[in-house]
Amino acid sequence: MTPRPSSSGPDPRKTTGKKPAGKTPTGKKPAKAAKKKAPRRTTASANASATTSVSGAEVAVSPAPDAADRERLLAGTHHDPHAVLGAHRVPGGVAFRVFRPYALAVTVLSGELRVGLHDDGDGFFSGLVPLKDVPAHRLLVAYEGTEQEVEDPYRFLPTLGELDLHLLGEGRHEQLWRALGAHPTTHEGVAGTRFAVWAPNARGVRVAGGFNFWDGTGHPMRSLGSTGVWELFLPGVGAGELYKFEITRPDGSRTFRADPLARRTEVPPATSSVVHASDYTWGDEEWLAHRADAPAHEAPMSVYEVHLPSWRPGLTYRQLAEQLPAYVADLGFTHVELMPVAEHPFGGSWGYQVTGFYAPTARLGDPDDFKYLVDRLHRAGIGVLMDWVPAHFPRDDWALAEFDGRPLYEHSDPLRAAHPDWGTLEFDFGRREVRNFLVANAVYWCEEFHIDGLRVDAVASMLYLDYSREPGEWEPNEHGGRENLDAVAFLQEMNATLYRRVPGVVTVAEESTAWDGVTRATHHEGPSGFGGLGFGLKWNMGWMHDSLDYMSHEPVHRKHHHGEMTFSMVYAYSENYVLPISHDEVVHGKRSLVSKMPGDWWQQRANERAYLGFMWAHPGKQLLFMGQEFAQGAEWSEAHGPDWWLLDPEYGASADHRGVRDLVRDLNTVYRATPALWRRDTHPSGFSWVVGDAAEDNVLAFLRLDADGTPLLAVSNFAPVVRSGYRLGVPDEVPAWHEVLNTDAARYGGGDVVNPDPVKPEPQGGTAARRASG
């Protein structure tokens, strides 16, 4: 290892040509004046080596690398530098070979043995020592004005075992992050960091970082058989070091690349990877012990969707941990869903164009800080879902795109590689190593960060070969269809692996088409001939679009759109659904939830309250994006986040916004306490229409039923008039009804048109009828 500069290390793309002071470029011998400054005991010339040996060993012959090895090492294209460098038994003793560009002299140290090596030029040093066995040894390396005693990285055996290599070759290493990437470790009694990267098309790979002044010339990696993996153990390198891989492409050009398996990164726009070692101690054992008590579709789930960087702009993970759990718990949500946390270079992508799939974004802190946030949420009784983006990745030339000089993570067919909507690249789901990268990534977040579930983004774009493509821009699959069979197999493998490894986890699909069996088990074949995709839940995009369209119309016109509020029950039990009012619906000119509603400010709030009441009563889990819980009027912006000032008592209209927030809190309280609202979300026996055809009245009414038949009656009046004495047919075995929530209550900012308590039905022909108002 060369002397470290005082700075943390510049961007390697800008500093490849910079050399530490007093050092000479590769290929040039140190000047004579420089030699005189080297320590006298290790002074060496190109033709002789002055040696001091307590044991009496002498360098008899210089076993320098042959011309071919030398050329490949200098060019960065050697596949097995350990076979040349380090110490090796040869006829006559042990040959020592060292490649230390810019060094003036190198001495081998082993116990009392001190042997100065020949300077063979171009940074190569060698010597033959008459020893019987290869000793454990260190190197004393002299530079101009200084010298360092270091370990020889080329004396170590590979750090990856046969099982790791077998699983890597099969594409079945379910803990891939433990094999690849950068890992501080102790190897053969020496502390350092193991670097490993998959780059099968590379002619050679070196590791560069602050520890070698971003010049990887002296640190070539070895290729491990047919796996395509390159590996090197660097003694003395520890947590916190910046690094990249310097890859020689098939055409001989070089590129610096961030580690695809980096578990920590620099803060964007900087792009280096960071060696990371976690020492976090979790405190969420009780949460994990009960997480699998009930499957997600049979448990209450009310989700608060959060964009962490803008929820309270400027807060770190640890600062968020002091505020977010308390806020979410106070409002009664069962889960948060975090928009993508994995590292991404462009904040304006909201995290949906990922470059660091294994690293939480460094904008808010380090990986242990993110663990602390998850831990605090769990200890507050809140589950953590995370948006996960396996469909595509950006084209940044320091990340995954043509990683080793050829299409690697992306499909080799340009028609399959380019995503037509986002200008990104789609993963090659048919390549086993790529599939392994993604499946292991899903497992990684759930095992290492205790994430309770993944909401998989853009599933529809993965499933169809013709997604957003015109005729001629795609080719059918082997059966002549438009289904992406590779993506189907990947999603099935991901879900099956995750559910097997992580008890209590849930996966959620953002899938906007009528694909059959999104939440069906992978081993159950459907009418289309495919097994299910194996997700636990699916976003109900149809319900969202239809219901929001209905609400956007003036009440006088809603009778013409009544079916948009009832059609969801036609297919409600075809999948396990989430009802999403997500970030996508409150940006880019779509307006916030309350601003979608017609009428004046009072009517807009009344409409939003009525809509939220309908949403919480409808079969399916709920998801609400931040800011909508208090009727923010403006669209969301990642630059400034929710308008919290609307809740400030000093603001004149704050009571209006606090009223909607209080409604959301009470909706969650009633929801969690009422099994009829969630236990039979996926069973037709849990729902019964009472009034489904009153289009002229803008009225809907239905029963939700618990497993024992205990009912809850939900009544929605989407007209701007009070319907006093409105008659509804209800089961006659219920003697009285208690109104648990009315969205028009004064405390929510409504007109306080509520029902008496209790409401007693009036018998009529074997069926009770109750009078309702509101």
Curated annotation (Swiss-Prot):
This is 1,4-alpha-glucan branching enzyme GlgB 1. It comes from Streptomyces coelicolor (strain ATCC BAA-471 / A3(2) / M145). It comes from the Bacteria. The gene is glgB1. Catalyzes the formation of the alpha-1,6-glucosidic linkages in glycogen by scission of a 1,4-alpha-linked oligosaccharide from growing alpha-1,4-glucan chains and the subsequent attachment of the oligosaccharide to the alpha-1,6 position. Monomer. It catalyses: Transfers a segment of a (1->4)-alpha-D-glucan chain to a primary hydroxy group in a similar glucan chain. Its EC number is 2.4.1.18. Belongs to the glycosyl hydrolase 13 family. GlgB subfamily. Keywords: Carbohydrate metabolism, Glycogen biosynthesis, Glycogen metabolism, Glycosyltransferase, Transferase. GO terms for molecular function: 1,4-alpha-glucan branching enzyme activity; cation binding; hydrolase activity, hydrolyzing O-glycosyl compounds. Residues 1-66, 748-774 are annotated as: Disordered.
